[in-house]
């Protein structure tokens, strides 16, 4: 295992990138290009609802999908997750050789410090999507990215978000961990990510992104991805 806060002591071959709530694998387009340039094979699947529909989909349903996918990938392998995807990555960290958490929803006890929200059984982000509100939510993105995101937001399971907000107990991962915190994240306060990183003795990368999704969809997404790729596969 790498020393705390140091780059991983192996060259990661593959990486599974797990998107956040209401999004999809498309969110990782910039990261995919960068990782491939660094010789890292990437998978960016969409999380799928359960057979009983989105309203019945649970956090465990998503965890099962992530575990099946990461187990199929050659080692050394990394799990990379953003927002809810970060929490899912934490829950599957036993299958990874390195873990990257981008503005992750934190596990308990830090989850208690998240802003409280009420979630319906199906969160209608697709139905209620508006280009203007999309642009406001990602001020660091260019117009083309904002338009693409507006057209691709999806509805989400309220049960998954309620479980995450209530707090999920996760032990400190045995693998190397890199946490990324946006300076102006209004959804997951950057200090929460910093506190998690300190407790887990993980490396903390603070980025100037102006939103929760900035490290993936902002103009600096490729630069952030390059820093991560160098940490995963030091040359």
Task: For the regions a language model picked out, list residue spans one by one.
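Active-site glycine-rich loops that stabilize anionic/oxyanionic intermediates
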Residues: 20-24, 83, 183-184
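Serine-hydrolase catalytic-loop signature spanning alpha/beta hydrolases and amidase-signature enzymes
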Residues: 22-30, 42
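Conserved alpha/beta-hydrolase
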Residues: 35-54
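Gly/Ala-rich beta-loop-alpha elbow adjacent to hydrolase catalytic centers
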Residues: 80-85, 89
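Flexible "cap/lid" loop of the alpha/beta hydrolase fold
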Residues: 94-125, 157-167
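Short beta-strand/loop motif that positions the catalytic acidic residue
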Residues: 173, 179-181
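Conserved alpha/beta-hydrolase "acid-adjacent" motif
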Residues: 186-195
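Catalytic histidine-centered segment of alpha/beta-hydrolase-like enzymes
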Residues: 210-223
């Amino acid at each position: 295992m790498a020393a705390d806060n140091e780059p991983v002591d192996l060259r990661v071959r593959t990486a599974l990138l797990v998107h956040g709530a209401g999004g999809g694998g498309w969110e990782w387009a910039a990261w995919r290009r960068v990782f491939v340039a660094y010789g890292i094979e990437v998978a960016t699947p969409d999380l799928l609802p359960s057979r009983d529909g989105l309203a019945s989909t649970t956090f465990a349903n998503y965890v099962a999908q992530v575990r099946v996918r990461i187990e199929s990938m050659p080692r050394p392998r990394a799990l990379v997750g953003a927002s809810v995807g970060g929490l899912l990555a934490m829950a599957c960290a036993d299958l990874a050789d390195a873990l990257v958490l981008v503005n992750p929803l934190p596990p308990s006890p830090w989850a208690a410090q998240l802003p409280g929200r009420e979630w319906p059984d199906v969160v209608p982000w697709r139905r209620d999507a508006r280009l203007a509100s999309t642009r406001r939510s990602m001020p660091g993105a260019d117009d083309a990215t904002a338009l693409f995101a507006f057209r691709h937001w999806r509805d989400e399971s309220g049960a998954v978000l309620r479980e995450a907000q209530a707090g999920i107990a996760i032990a400190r991962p045995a693998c190397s961990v890199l946490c990324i915190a946006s300076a102006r994240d209004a959804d997951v306060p950057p200090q929460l990510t910093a506190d998690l990183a300190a407790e887990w003795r993980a490396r903390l990368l603070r980025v100037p992104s102006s939103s929760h999704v900035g490290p993936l969809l902002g103009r600096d997404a490729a630069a952030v991805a390059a820093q991560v790729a160098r940490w995963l596969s030091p040359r």
